[in-house]
Design a protein with these regions (language model features):
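N-terminal secretory signal peptides
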Residues: 1-11, 18-32
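Extracytoplasmic "Venus flytrap"/periplasmic binding protein-like
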Residues: 91-168, 199-207, 312-313, 329, ...
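Extracytoplasmic/periplasmic solute-binding protein
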Residues: 174-187, 192, 216-266
Length: 484
């Protein structure tokens, strides 16, 4: 995603078919748990349910019971966000616990770690992003992930009177669950949407559209200037889903989107918003509003075309500012806009935004030092390191208000403003996280054909429902459910 989530690729953003416990790239793509009580002061070396094994004595300064001098190993996805932010947190861990964290930065998380999980010797903490990420759903179902409830209930580093959970965006607590276990910690907070150059729009006298109709009209005006209105990474068409799925939820309402997340019968075909949104994308394609050749571009290539002024809009996540930095002009003034209005019948207001946790961290229950892995996360969740993350990689974290008072880069500033303006109308889409093979491979294939004009909207919807039904009936696919 950033990150990505897998989709670099990412979170969240990023994915591909899951085979075994590794998510394998599809279509040339780039990106439970224990139960029981917590630790204590008894220096327990066993795994007492949700509490991590190999604990030392706890104290006010060491609430999780990290053993000083105990080795800690971290595998960090080194994609669009890099891994320096993690190294910085590891340096503080080193100073506190008298050990040098063994650090590996890689884009091959799954291929490197799948055999280690199978062999029972995984690293302690993993940033599980990128196209070649581990299948967390399967790992959770196999009981290989540490339940992180103990971390959530620990005192925060900045204010011991406040629990870690109370410093986080609520969606972080929701998204990290697998049934009754909280075993995935999404560290970043990604804003998905339509990205553009504020300077370009201002110089041309164009206004960011508020509705589908406004967008179609503006695209016509843009095309007349010889510039493409849109581009996208056609080799990874699921990037388009970042916007498409959220638009469906914005227009049709969250309840109807939740039915799609839950793989309910007729969830796609009975939702009028699906028809309206998919037809909008079909219209963009029919009128030639996508940059010629976009269907063959990678995420980096499409971003480069965009930053070089060949296209005005691109669907992406807030990691794009950091990832596209090498080709972005200094005066580009990167910005992100909210979802578009479909009409007077929209269930959610203008300003609605897809903004959700990304960059998934997991702690291996069978690692040598899972409690140390949780402590490294606690350090990362301090204001110091949340701000360091924002400064180094131009992205928000799961820590509420961590960037207040900071001077932010243009893209990050725009994303933060959009989150504030969205208020309670921030959407979280689970389908891409729960069923990546469905969304990235199956639906991604449909979207690829839709955007080249080789598939009609009605056929896209029909086949999307067909694929969703197949997944719903497949007993080999772990199912998830959400109420809100």
């Amino acid at each position: 995603m950033g990150s990505t989530s897998s989709f670099n690729r990412r979170d969240l953003v990023k994915r591909a078919a899951a085979l075994g416990i590794i998510a394998v790239p599809a279509m040339g793509t780039l990106s439970a748990c224990a139960t029981g009580g917590g630790g204590g002061n008894d220096g327990n070396d066993g795994n007492d349910g949700k509490g991590a094994k190999n604990k030392g004595a706890t104290s006010a300064k060491n609430p999780l019971g990290v053993k000083k001098g105990a080795a800690l190993e971290a595998f960090i996805f080194k994609g669009g966000l890099g891994d320096q932010y993690a190294k910085d947190a590891e340096a503080d861990y080193d100073k506190t616990y008298g050990v040098t964290v063994k650090h590996t930065g890689t884009q091959q998380v799954g291929p490197k770690l799948q055999p280690r999980f199978a062999g029972g010797n995984p690293p302690d903490i993993i940033d599980n992003s990128g196209a070649d990420h581990l299948d967390m759903n399967k790992l959770s179902a196999q009981g290989q992930l540490q339940d992180l409830t103990e971390l959530l209930d620990a005192p925060s580093l900045d204010d011991p009177k406040k629990k870690v959970r109370d410093t986080l965006y609520p969606s972080t607590l929701e998204k990290g669950k697998h049934k009754d276990a909280f075993d995935v910690f999404y560290y970043a907070f990604t804003v998905y949407g339509t990205w553009y150059s504020h300077k370009l729009l201002k110089d041309k006298g164009w206004a960011y559209p508020t509705s589908f109709d406004d967008m179609i009209k503006l695209c016509g005006d843009i095309k007349k200037t010889g510039v493409a209105p849109w581009t996208y990474p056609g080799k990874y068409p699921y990037y388009v889903h970042f916007n498409m799925f959220a638009q469906i939820a914005k227009i049709g309402g969250l309840d109807k989107w939740i039915a799609i997340d839950n793989l309910e019968p007729r969830a796609w075909t009975s939702n009028d918003a699906v028809k309206q949104v998919v037809e909008h994308y079909a219209e963009l394609a029919a009128k030639g509003y996508f940059l010629q050749g976009s269907q063959g571009l990678t995420h980096i290539q499409s971003q480069t075309a965009w930053t070089r002024g060949k296209a005005v809009f691109i669907p992406n996540g807030s990691w794009v500012e950091n990832e596209a930095a090498p080709t972005t002009p200094k005066d580009f003034d990167m910005a992100v806009g909210p979802l578009f209005n479909g009409g007077s019948g929209d269930k959610m207001p203008h300003g609605t935004l897809r903004a959700e946790p990304s960059e998934p961290f997991i702690v291996a229950k069978d690692g040598k030092n899972p409690v140390g892995g949780m402590e490294l996360l606690r350090i990362l969740l301090s204001k110091k390191h949340a701000q360091n993350f924002a400064t180094k990689v131009r992205s928000l974290t799961a820590v509420k208000g961590a960037t207040e008072g900071m001077r932010l880069s243009p893209g990050l500033s725009s994303a933060a403003e959009a989150v504030t303006a969205g208020g309670r109308n921030l959407l979280m889409i689970q389908l891409q996280e729960w069923y990546p093979k469905l969304t990235d491979e199956k639906l991604g294939g449909l979207t690829s054909q839709l955007l080249t004009g080789d598939m009609k909207a009605a056929e896209w919807i029909k086949k999307a429902q067909q694929y969703a039904d197949e997944f719903a009936k497949d007993d080999s696919v772990t199912k998830f459910h959400r109420e809100a």
